[in-house]
Design a protein with these regions (language model features):
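Active-site beta-loop-alpha junctions enriched in small/polar residues
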Residues: 73, 104-106, 123-127, 150-154, ...
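Surface-exposed cleft-lining segments at the edges of enzyme active sites
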Residues: 70-79, 122, 181-188
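Auxiliary Fe-S-binding modules of radical SAM enzymes
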Residues: 1-22, 43, 153, 159-238
Length: 238
């Protein structure tokens, strides 16, 4: 299963959001210009993280298969394991959907069990976060694992991370690399050379690449035709 053609055109690697956790707290530089927190503050909403059990039925109510992005961070320390398990159970009970669980705190999900329709991913904005988070992701059972290199704030050398060596006799443990610049009026720059280097690394490992958005001509672009020709890449794992 993959995102719909309409979402493909927009660069979205999901069809529908599932906000099972409201709010979040800063954990690393990627959080500094968080649009969700800015909107919450603008409208006077609380940014304190809390689990939303009233939304557990959302995937059950949709019968048509869809790719769900699980927002916000299921690995947040404010959640206890019972709450995390309830979210995973709701996903397991709706196998017609694919769930993409993205966390900046992958160590908290290491006790999760592998479920065929759940992919686990972690955000990697720079080398320190790659070194810190990817090993935890690799230690977590998952049908597939992915990296969200967005916002990409610095060059990242994946080969420096233990477990990401390219070995002829062992499948590469990452199934997808999503790459993108930061958005918003206070966005920090993403050098296209960093993006190209990551694409080369992914190619060497046989990993599909999904380039979500890039800053071109001073604007954040989402359409492939606005990207440099060699970066018009949106691939999906088989």
């Amino acid at each position: 299963m993959k995102p719909s053609p309409a979402n493909y055109e927009k660069g979205k690697w999901w069809d529908l959001p599932w906000t099972i956790v409201d709010g979040c707290t800063r954990v690393s530089p990627a959080c500094d210009n968080c649009w969700a927190m800015a909107i919450a503050r603008r409208f006077g909403r609380s940014t304190e993280p809390r689990f939303r059990p009233d939304r557990l039925e959302i995937p059950h109510r949709r019968k048509k298969p869809a790719v769900f992005a699980v927002w916000n961070d299921l690995g947040h320390p404010c959640l206890d394991w019972l709450e995390i398990n309830r979210a995973f159970l709701a996903m397991a009970e709706t196998p017609q959907h694919l769930f993409l669980v993205l966390t900046k705190r992958p160590a908290r999900l290491r006790d999760a069990r592998e479920i065929p329709n759940i992919w686990l991913g972690t955000t990697v904005e720079d080398q320190p976060r790659a070194d810190e988070r990817i090993p935890h992701l690799l230690d977590t059972p998952a049908a597939k694992r992915f990296l969200s290199l967005e916002p990409l704030l610095a060059p990242v050398n994946l080969s420096r991370v233990p477990g990401l060596e390219i070995l002829d006799d062992k499948p590469f443990p990452i199934s997808l690399c999503v790459i993108g610049c930061e958005s918003g009026p206070r966005r920090r720059p993403t050098d296209l050379a960093w993006v190209r280097d990551l694409v080369e690394q992914a190619r060497a490992a046989g990993v599909p690449v999904w380039i979500k958005q890039l800053e071109v001509g001073g604007k954040v672009r989402h359409r492939l035709e606005d990207f440099p020709e060699d970066l018009r890449i949106r691939e999906w794992p088989e």
